[in-house]
Amino acid sequence: DGKVILNDNGLPIRDNFQQNLGHTDPKWILGFQNSFKYKNMSLDIGIDGVWGGVMRSLTVEKMWWGGKHPYSTEFRDAEYAAGTPVYVPEGVNVVSGELVQDANGNVVSDNRVFKPNTTAVSWQTWSQNYPYRAQVTEAENKTFANVFDRSFFKLRSLVFKYDFTDLINIKGIKHFDMTFTGYNLLMWKEADIIDPDYGNDNNLQDPSTRYLGMGLNFK
């Protein structure tokens, strides 16, 4: 039923076979580039993005390991005050039976009987195991997820120019315009915390940088 299977110590049991969590390539790659002009004003706009696909975030995994994830302090103070583990992972323990799989990981038989887990574990131990060592999708557990939907749309570029030539009368200046430029201004994304613009996060990349600029052009 999708619950994590835990051992007697309350920690996840490693699957002997790898599972397919999705494709890293998106279903769609989209882009829009256009220019608009009205009298002395012009506007260039660029929007792009992808739809579908998944990405693993090594950054999120390392944040859990090092206690830097926004949720990584959730039970730490309570555990410190109690002097004993207080976090009881949501999952099940095997009471009896066994799972038999073939060489490809297909289930041959499964007569296991489960019970809800009641074992509390150290919050640090849990954080440095499940969300760090396992590949967790948002569908499996949104709090501990490190595999995300990489869909996003971004206002990649916006360039606004205004020509002041007709408004000024300065000797020696035949043309004068001002330009405002912006890159990576806005983003809609499915994933929290991370920047899916890179397509993967295996090298602990910094997120894309927002840039704002202004230029003056005299002739």
Where are the model-predicted features located?
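Repeated loop/turn-to-beta-strand initiation elements of outer-membrane beta-barrel proteins
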Residues: 40-45, 167-168
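Hydrophobic, lipid-facing positions within transmembrane beta-strands of outer-membrane proteins
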Residues: 28-34, 155-160, 210-216
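C-terminal beta-signal and terminal closure region of outer-membrane beta-barrel proteins
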Residues: 67-73, 78-85, 104, 140, ...
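Extracytoplasmic loops and strand-loop junctions of Gram-negative outer membrane beta-barrel proteins
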Residues: 11-20, 138-145, 196-200
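Membrane-embedded beta-strand positions of outer-membrane beta-barrel proteins
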Residues: 45, 178-180, 216
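Outer-membrane beta-barrel pore domains and translocons
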Residues: 37, 48-50, 181-185, 219
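Extracytoplasmic gating/loop element in the C-terminal half of outer-membrane beta-barrel translocons
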Residues: 50-172
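Outer-envelope beta-barrel architecture signal
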Residues: 28, 39-41, 151, 172-176, ...
